[in-house]
């Protein structure tokens, strides 16, 4: 039966007795829940001083190393002994083959009352192993023999894996994370979870159901790897009516900042209703035009959220965020999430006052914000499929009917570069003379803006559709059929 000795994060033993006891209990419970999700039974779990001894019926080293609150986990052999000589022989007999023809070092930690020191143990074991090795090298050994002596038991370390540290999940409250699925928001979610906060995901569907399903897949991967001691929720809000409202009533350069403010407003209402302690975003200072310090101050001042807004990545640059994404195993998943078609791709204002922002928000139909905040959809990350998490729209299609009028709604430069055969650019379309008895298929890069336009055209009596997932997904599908 595999046995593991877990070194908890260094801050846990420093807490008060009451808090320390609560954190150990939560950590052991999280370990049990995570292993149970992998059909692994936790046979034994007990606190030994500042460490936790765990026994499982099958190998579980990697699973244990993915639990917040764990600093290091080591597979160990438990040795009982009566004196130093017996202990040294037990250790040597189990490690001879490991040190054979290699330079080695013996590292010993000891606690409790003994008639010997840690150095005595190291010397005795080293003397027994030296004839089988290339000698002792304390500075640059090929292999280390690591032993921890506690009372009348010794723990001989073998496989070791580093954990994430932090605090046990659920020990610090609940957070609602604004989640796009790109590089930033998953790393922000991971960082706040590392501090003991259970996170749920709030995703705004900006038009393309395909992009939103990709975001759900990132949330599931993050949950499987790091959050499996509870059941995270994926909450979606159809933001397309608000985007349409912004495009109709707000000048080009202000749209992105107004959109961010509306995201805060809806998130704050949902967080308050569902009892979250905080809202978390993946914002990094000045990474985007709408994320300058002036704009962030203006947005928060204009919205005045009841919830505290936490930004774990505020001081990170993009390269650091991407490196974290790689380290926590999400890079390949986040890199597949396409950016939604921008409502203001250029000339975004970098400095706005809260008064100006408030005046812009007042142009909008505030009833839409209330409606969107009340029409959220909640699914369990582990049990739902991407299609259940993000249902498709009736306006979306996967292929282009043969008699369709095809309209490219991207920039004119992109249209000239790689438009679909037979497509015309949006700027060339005379909607007064456009036939209403033929399918009109619109496309953009990811399917977001084209969906909004398709809805608008349907309201005017056209048989309008949006290419699901945009041009990239459509062309990828064509490649597969060739």
Curated annotation (Swiss-Prot):
Write down the InterPro entries for this protein, in alphabetical order: Rhodanese-like_dom, Rhodanese-like_dom_sf, Rossmann-like_a/b/a_fold, ThiI_AANH, ThiI_fer, ThiI_N, THUMP_dom, THUMP_ThiI
Could you provide one GO biological process annotation from this protein's UniProt record? thiazole biosynthetic process
Quickly give the catalysed reaction: [ThiI sulfur-carrier protein]-S-sulfanyl-L-cysteine + a uridine in tRNA + 2 reduced [2Fe-2S]-[ferredoxin] + ATP + H(+) = [ThiI sulfur-carrier protein]-L-cysteine + a 4-thiouridine in tRNA + 2 oxidized [2Fe-2S]-[ferredoxin] + AMP + diphosphate; [ThiS sulfur-carrier protein]-C-terminal Gly-Gly-AMP + S-sulfanyl-L-cysteinyl-[cysteine desulfurase] + AH2 = [ThiS sulfur-carrier protein]-C-terminal-Gly-aminoethanethioate + L-cysteinyl-[cysteine desulfurase] + A + AMP + 2 H(+)
Boundaries of every Rhodanese domain copy:
400-482
Query: Which annotated residues bind ATP?
Result: 178-179, 203-204, 260, 282, 291
Keyword tRNA-binding attached? yes
Query: Which compartment or compartments is the protein found in?
Result: Cytoplasm
One Pfam family here: Rhodanese
- Where the record annotates domain THUMP, the positions are 58-160
The organism's superkingdom is given as Archaea
Q: Where is the active site?
A: 444 (cysteine persulfide intermediate)
Q: What keyword terms does UniProt attach to this protein?
A: ATP-binding, Cytoplasm, Disulfide bond, Nucleotide-binding, Redox-active center, RNA-binding, Thiamine biosynthesis, Transferase, tRNA-binding
Tell me the PROSITE patterns matching this sequence: RHODANESE_3, THUMP
- Top EC class, one word: transferase
Q: What is an example of a GO molecular function annotated in this UniProt entry?
A: CCA tRNA nucleotidyltransferase activity
Give the E.C. number(s). Answer: 2.8.1.4
Just give the chief location class. cytoplasm
Which cellular component terms (GO) are annotated to the entry? cytosol
Q: Which family does it belong to?
A: Belongs to the ThiI family.
Function text: Catalyzes the ATP-dependent transfer of a sulfur to tRNA to produce 4-thiouridine in position 8 of tRNAs, which functions as a near-UV photosensor. Also catalyzes the transfer of sulfur to the sulfur carrier protein ThiS, forming ThiS-thiocarboxylate. This is a step in the synthesis of thiazole, in the thiamine biosynthesis pathway. The sulfur is donated as persulfide by IscS.
Under which name does UniProt file this protein? tRNA sulfurtransferase
Q: Native species of this protein?
A: Desulfurococcus amylolyticus (strain DSM 18924 / JCM 16383 / VKM B-2413 / 1221n) (Desulfurococcus kamchatkensis)
Q: What gene name is listed for this protein? A: thiI
């Amino acid at each position: 039966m595999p046995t593991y000795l877990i070194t908890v994060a260094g801050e846990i033993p420093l807490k008060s007795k009451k808090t320390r006891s609560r954190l150990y209990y939560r950590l052991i419970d999280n370990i049990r829940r995570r292993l149970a999700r992998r059909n692994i039974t936790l046979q034994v779990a007990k606190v030994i001083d500042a460490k936790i001894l765990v026994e499982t019926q099958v190998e579980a080293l990697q699973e244990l190393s993915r639990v917040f609150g764990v600093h290091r986990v080591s597979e160990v052999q438990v040795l009982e002994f009566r004196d130093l000589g017996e202990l040294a022989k037990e250790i040597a007999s189990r490690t001879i083959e490991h040190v054979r023809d290699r330079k080695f070092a013996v590292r010993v930690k000891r606690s409790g009352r003994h008639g010997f020191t840690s150095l005595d143990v190291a010397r005795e074991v080293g003397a027994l192993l030296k004839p089988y090795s290339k000698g002792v090298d304390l500075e640059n050994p090929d292999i280390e023999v690591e032993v921890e002596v506690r009372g009348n038991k010794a723990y001989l370390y073998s496989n070791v894996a580093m954990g994430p540290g932090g605090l046990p999940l659920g020990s610090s409250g609940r957070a609602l994370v604004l989640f796009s699925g790109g590089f930033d928001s998953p790393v922000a979610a991971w960082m706040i979870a590392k501090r003991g906060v259970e996170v749920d995901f709030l995703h705004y569907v900006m038009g393309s159901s395909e992009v939103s399903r990709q975001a759900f897949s990132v949330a599931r991967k993050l949950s499987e790897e790091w959050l499996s001691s509870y059941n995270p929720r994926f909450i979606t809000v159809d933001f397309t009516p608000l985007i349409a409202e912004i495009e109709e009533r707000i000048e080009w350069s202000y749209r992105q900042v107004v959109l961010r403010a509306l995201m805060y407003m809806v998130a704050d209402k949902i967080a308050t209703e569902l009892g979250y302690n905080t809202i978390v975003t993946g914002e990094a200072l000045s990474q985007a035009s709408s994320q300058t310090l002036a704009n962030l101050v203006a947005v928060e001042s204009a919205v005045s959220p009841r919830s505290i807004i936490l930004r774990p990545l505020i001081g990170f640059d993009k390269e650091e965020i991407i490196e974290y994404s790689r380290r926590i195993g999400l890079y390949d998943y986040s890199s597949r999430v396409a950016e939604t078609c921008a409502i203001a791709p250029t000339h975004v204002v970098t400095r706005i006052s809260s008064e100006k922002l408030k005046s812009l928000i007042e142009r909008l139909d505030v009833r839409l914000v209330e409606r969107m905040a009340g029409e959220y959809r909640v699914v369990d990350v582990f049990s739902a499929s991407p299609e259940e998490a993000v249902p498709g729209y009736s306006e979306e299609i996967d292929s282009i009917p043969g008699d369709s009028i095809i309209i490219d709604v991207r920039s004119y430069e992109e249209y000239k570069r790689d438009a679909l055969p037979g497509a015309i650019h949006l700027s060339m379309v005379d909607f007064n003379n456009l036939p209403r008895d033929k399918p009109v298929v619109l496309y953009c890069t990811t399917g977001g803006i084209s969906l909004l336009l398709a809805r608008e055209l349907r309201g005017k009596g056209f048989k309008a559709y949006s290419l699901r997932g945009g041009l990239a997904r459509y062309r990828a599908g064509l490649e597969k059929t060739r």
